[in-house]
Amino acid sequence: MSELRTLPVLPLRDIVVFPHMVVPLFVGRDKSVRALEEVMRGDKQILLVTQKNSADDDPAPGDIFEVGVLATVLQLLKLPDGTVKVLVEGKARAAVVSFTDQESYYEAQIGEVSEDDGAGPEAEALSRAVVEQFENYVKLNKKVPPEALASIPQIAEPGKLADSIAAHLSVKIGDKQNLLEIFDVVKRLEKVFALMEGEISVLQVEKKIRSRVKRQMEKTQREYYLNEQMKAIQRELGDPDDARDELIDLEKRIKKTKLSKEARTKAESELKKLRNMSPMSAESTVVRNYLDWLLSIPWGKAKTKKIDLVESEGILDADHYGLEKVKERILEYLAVQARTNSLKGPILCLVGPPGVGKTSLGKSIAKATGREFVRMSLGGVRDEAEIRGHRRTYIGSMPGKVVQSMKKAKTTNAFVLLDEIDKMGSDYRGDPASALLEVLDPSQNSTFGDHYLEVDYDLSQVMFVTTANSLNMPQPLLDRMEIIRIPGYTEDEKLEIAKRHILPKLAKDHGLKPAEFIVPDKAIRDLIRYYTREAGVRSLERELGALARKTVRDLAREKVASITIDDERLAKYAGVKKYRYGETDEVDQVGIVTGLAWTEFGGDILTIEAVKMPGKGRMQITGNLKDVMKESIAAANSYVRSRALQFGIKPPVFEKTDVHIHVPDGATPKDGPSAGIAMALAMVSVLTGIPIRKDIAMTGEITLRGRVTAIGGLKEKLLAALRSGVKTVLIPQENEKDLADVPQTVKDGLEIIPVSTVDEVLKHALTGPLTPVEWNEAEEPITTSAKKDDGDSDAMLTH
């Protein structure tokens, strides 16, 4: 290596420059332009180094290869768009010793790499072989200019020969960089020879593929010509027997099927078109598939069964325990249909957490009405064509899910359950929710248009029922449906469901007789309390399924006649308890409140923690809280400060104290205003030092005047409180009327206290009374450096 020198660096993307190469480059990055400007002020020497990742716009020294080329700038031209066109000539290999950041560009300390002259018989033999191989390569690769064949053989120096050929190879940047980093001339020639051999093999395969494709195209054109001749002959001689039989069969089906006038005209037109086509043509297959779909869906085929309300009620009661109000509304719906013999009523939408029986309720309604049940899953549907079908111009086109469901039902008055309607999405392919508007509108669905069928189809006799976990769907879609909420089950209801439905099903699935698998009520209750925490019964079914599997195993292992799941076996089979039930903190604590939340999966408890520390009056909020909950905290903060003296808090405390409010389970986003009174209680507790009762939970929105306003999801929240072992729940006075919808077992298990003001909340929740204080501003002034609670970003830090 020669003596070290320092040069500006020009990082290259997607190109490796070799010595003796003259290359035009377009430079647009600021650092690269400034490096060139610096070079032009000096001796026009620059280091060209390839960067490792071509997508990197600002490569660091570690992102650049350590071997490059010392080059001379021959010409530089600034273009109108701010970029620079530069002509460079590679001089010699250079190894980078270190990089220096000059802010506007990088400099590198380099040393030129000395190479041997490559003299010797081995180098001479390799040079001849490489030149011969290069001639073969140029014949196959049309991208190499023909003049290269004239210039390359004239190069006498083996090293220069290897570099010149490497510059013309269509190989990966990494392979070219490897060649640049090979300083031994003989090894470099060997590497170039190996790379050319690999490229020649690939080019030969490409040539074979091109020849094969060309022959295939000629064959296709020949087949087309022969098919046209065959069609002419067929017109003279008549159709073959098979094709004629198929056409006769299609004609009979068209006459037999009760098509609409529009559909019959379309079918006859397509059949006429099919008669004039070759049976072997691709277009005839498309037409045959279309006619098959058109004639396979039901036209005027209806199953009739009079709705018997007593029988329907018996089916609903047999299939589902509890859900009395839901079943009552469904029976009302069926009664109106039975009386009017019409389906012009609202579309029912069953909304509730997972595992509460929405889909099975749909099956029961279908059984009660005597209709064919078809489930149409909409979860993950993002393409409008999945609802309306694809147009026939596309390869592999077919009707949408609605028409496919009708074909499966084989009757025009089927029962179609649109499952998970809230899980649809939309993207550049359209909005499937908008396509459903026509399906679910009784005044429009008699002329439903599927893109594939291209004729109107009558859906007015179909009974549509939808299911969803939440109401997170477009408003026009919601307007077409009547929402029936299915809340979570109480503990007693889960117990009965397990005994009546889950255990018999599991025993049958696992080959167990009732006498072999005995699960007492206590074991089921323990599973509900300590191993599941859900609104539905899916987790309970999984836990009972685990007990059944272990029972089957132990019946074979222990050679006993039956197994009873007592406390010992439950602990052995189910493992460690996953949840606490009926256990509260041992002591009342300052700043820790139990709130109640509603999610699309049911109710849940929401622990809120608050601490104070010396500071400058800042409020810090953590726990993945969204905007509405942050505003609720701000309102609670303002209310507490406005009533500070009545609560026993002197105003200077606010300027000297930082308060941190945290809602655990930070991975789960949280939003909504119903934790307002819990936030206010936490602030008062932490600022006064008075503990909060450990066995109390609450829900309610707060106003700036301290009034407690109504919230939603009361039943789900009370169920969550009961599941969690809370004894007392504070609810807004305005929600007292909603207690009529809450099961009596829940009301019996909780002490429910309606409140209308924050003062009442503090009275019930704090363990001690609040002592008002007096404050003389002259004696204890508020300093001007205190942070004002004006709602700006300085008053509240959120993370």
Swiss-Prot record:
Main localization category: cytoplasm
Free-text function comment from the UniProt entry: ATP-dependent serine protease that mediates the selective degradation of mutant and abnormal proteins as well as certain short-lived regulatory proteins. Required for cellular homeostasis and for survival from DNA damage and developmental changes induced by stress. Degrades polypeptides processively to yield small peptide fragments that are 5 to 10 amino acids long. Binds to DNA in a double-stranded, site-specific manner. CcrM is an important target of the Lon protease pathway in C.crescentus.
Alphabetical list of Gene3D superfamilies matching this protein: 1.10.8.60, 1.20.5.5270, 1.20.58.1480, 3.30.230.10, LON domain-like, P-loop containing nucleotide triphosphate hydrolases
Swiss-Prot/TrEMBL GO biological process terms: cellular response to heat; protein quality control for misfolded or incompletely synthesized proteins
GO cellular component: cytoplasm
Pfam assignment, any one: Lon_C
Knockout mutant characteristics: Cells grow more slowly, cells stall in predivisional stage, about half eventually divide. Abnormal initiation of extra rounds of DNA replication. CcrM methyltransferase is present at all stages of the cell cycle, at least partially responsible for the above phenotypes.
Entry's family note: Belongs to the peptidase S16 family.
Lon N-terminal domain ranges (all copies): 7-200
Phylogenetic lineage: Bacteria, Pseudomonadati, Pseudomonadota, Alphaproteobacteria, Caulobacterales
Reaction equation(s) it catalyzes: Hydrolysis of proteins in presence of ATP
Residues noted as binding ATP in the record, renumbered to the chain: G352, P353, P354, G355, V356, G357, K358, T359
Subcellular location, record wording: Cytoplasm
Record-given protein name: Lon protease
Boundaries of every Lon proteolytic domain copy: 587-768
Subunit text: Homohexamer. Organized in a ring with a central cavity.
Disulfide bonds: none
Lineage: superkingdom: Bacteria
Active-site residues annotated for this sequence: S674, K717
Record-listed E.C. numbers: 3.4.21.53
Keywords of this entry: ATP-binding, Cytoplasm, Hydrolase, Nucleotide-binding, Protease, Serine protease, Stress response
Source species: Caulobacter vibrioides (strain NA1000 / CB15N) (Caulobacter crescentus)
